[in-house]
């Protein structure tokens, strides 16, 4: 539902995890709207019984908590996507009558024919978002099963590409992982792909593994044209921009990702990492420390922002703080070494040299 609404031009839609932070809580709708910075709230319930699904939904005006629209939808369980499309159409009509039907049609995307494949994909997401070696393996297992059932499911291929890329970079630079990452990325970026999420992941993976930053940014711009409310796409765009020393774009897109998803902790470490890195390359080391700290808070098990924090403290001339951060980095990733990180070749040599020089100053393993 959130994905479909986000694709409609003219709508600013808060991401799933931020929205769901209030689920099950007795919170005044006006307070929720104020915290998220939105004008309307959509709430409702889904019930399933004897092969039927019933969706009750209501739209509230955030400033007054008054009802704008309410309705109930019912259909067969296998028609859940049709119910979502109908709900999208009604809500868009209630919020902005001038939105054209053609834009509602653009919100309808290709989906896997099998709900089983979709369910496996959904179950893989939290493991992928954790971005640790063990969780990445779990995600790849589920994504592999999903793709077996639905070989053309580009969203699953996008996540598989990302997971294989992460495993390649953080688990010994196994060339088979790199090949798998690029293979899935190519499918995610295929000629029939119009899924902004899959496009964003495929572009990010190719940028990291081939350093074709210009091509990746072109694809990311296409993805954002399809879905201008994608926090994930803006986050990946910020990372690619930081990796390629496009400071202004990295800052702009990093903050845009955070604005779209202010409470989305499982994914906010992406824009925070981008902001930490781009500020390091720009010589703004206090900002590096600040954003690296936020990235660690969002995902403590992800090792890379710990490295950025080390580098930021070195840049500020605080070697003692850098050594504390370095010890924490090794607790999270005992196998981390500066040489192995350098061999990932994530950035062009001048940028990588600056970062690894700072890490070496903190006495991290070579």
Predicted features along the sequence, with ranges:
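Terminal, low-structured helical/coil segments at or just beyond the last alpha-helical repeat
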Residues: 338-366
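A generic structural signal for well-ordered alpha-helical surface patches
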Residues: 307-308, 324-327, 353
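TPR/TPR-like (Sel1-like) alpha-helical repeat modules
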Residues: 314-337
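Acidic, proline/glycine-rich low-complexity intrinsically disordered segments
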Residues: 1-316
């Amino acid at each position: 539902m959130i994905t479909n609404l986000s694709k409609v031009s003219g709508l600013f839609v808060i991401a799933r995890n931020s929205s769901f932070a209030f689920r099950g809580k007795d919170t005044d709708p006006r307070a929720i709207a104020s915290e998220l910075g939105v004008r309307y709230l959509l709430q409702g319930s889904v019930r399933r019984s004897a092969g039927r699904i019933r969706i009750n939904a209501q739209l509230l005006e955030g400033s007054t908590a008054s009802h704008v629209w309410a309705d109930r939808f019912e259909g067969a369980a296998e028609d859940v996507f049709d119910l979502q499309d109908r709900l999208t159409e009604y809500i868009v009509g209630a919020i902005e009558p001038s939105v054209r039907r053609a834009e509602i049609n653009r919100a309808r995307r290709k989906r896997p024919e099998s709900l089983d494949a979709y369910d496996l994909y959904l179950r893989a997401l939290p493991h992928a978002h954790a971005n640790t070696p063990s969780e990445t393996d779990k995600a790849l297992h589920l994504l592999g099963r999903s793709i077996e059932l639905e070989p053309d499911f580009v969203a699953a291929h996008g996540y598989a590409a990302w997971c294989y890329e992460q495993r390649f970079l953080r688990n010994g630079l196994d060339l088979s992982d790199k090949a798998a990452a690029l293979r899935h990325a190519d499918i995610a970026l295929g000629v029939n792909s119009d899924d902004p999420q899959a496009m964003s992941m495929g572009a990010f993976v190719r940028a990291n593994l081939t350093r074709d930053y210009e091509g990746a940014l072109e694809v990311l711009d296409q993805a954002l044209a399809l879905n201008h409310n994608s926090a994930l796409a803006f986050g990946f765009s910020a990372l690619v921009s930081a990796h390629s020393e496009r400071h202004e774009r990295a800052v702009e897109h990093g903050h845009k990702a955070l604005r779209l998803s202010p409470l989305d902790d499982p994914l906010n470490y992406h824009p925070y990492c981008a902001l930490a890195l781009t500020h390091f390359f720009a010589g703004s080391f206090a900002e590096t420390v600040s954003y690296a700290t936020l990235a660690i808070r969002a995902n403590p098990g992800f090792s890379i922002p710990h490295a950025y924090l080390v580098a930021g403290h070195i840049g500020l001339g605080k070697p003692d703080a850098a050594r504390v951060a370095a010890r924490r980095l090794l607790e999270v990733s005992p196998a981390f070494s500066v040489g192995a990180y350098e061999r990932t070749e994530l950035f062009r040599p001048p940028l990588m040299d600056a970062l690894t020089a700072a890490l070496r100053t903190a006495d991290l393993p070579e």
